[in-house]
Amino acid sequence: MSSSSPSSSDGSPAEAAPDGYPMLGAEPVDGVRLLRAPAVPTAVVQATDVPMATIAGLFDAVFGKIFPVAFEQGLRPAGPAFALYTRLTDGPDAAADVEIGFPLDGPLLEQVHDDAVEIDGLRLVASVIPAGEVAVTTHLGGFDGLGRAWGEFIGEIGAMGRAPGIPFWESYVTEPSPDMDPAELRTDLYCLVRTPDDAA
């Protein structure tokens, strides 16, 4: 993650989200930016209390089973795949409540009209990325570096006079492939934030 830009100083006002949000543009985000972001409809699979040690298997099932069927039924993503976390516990038995899916240009039911997509207990549902003030940054590199990137990101949010909130999410801008260099992977990180007064 790159160092903070001048716009990330303490007390900076948020700027309007770019056209095409939640996509942030062709170039990686330089430092940390604060955005006034609109709500975005999504198509997701929701899962609760997922052990972080096995969450990769959930991703494989969602993208390998659910979304191929949804695409056949007419689902049209408006951006890269993402994972949005509404709860995350710490420690050796860390677990999360998570939504895995894609942003949409409109409501899910306007695109997928057939019976609900449900396979092996996983069900495609409509959800939303919430509106609000959102901090964003970019991580360049392998997925194994995301933990450190999130730690640095949360620290920079505090330095900007904000408190990190829930949910937080990551957008997988670069689709991984077996023969690519992990250093070329781009993941955009997002976190709903509050001012100290809101957090009190």
Predicted regions: what they are:
Residues 1-200:
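A solvent-exposed interaction/effector surface
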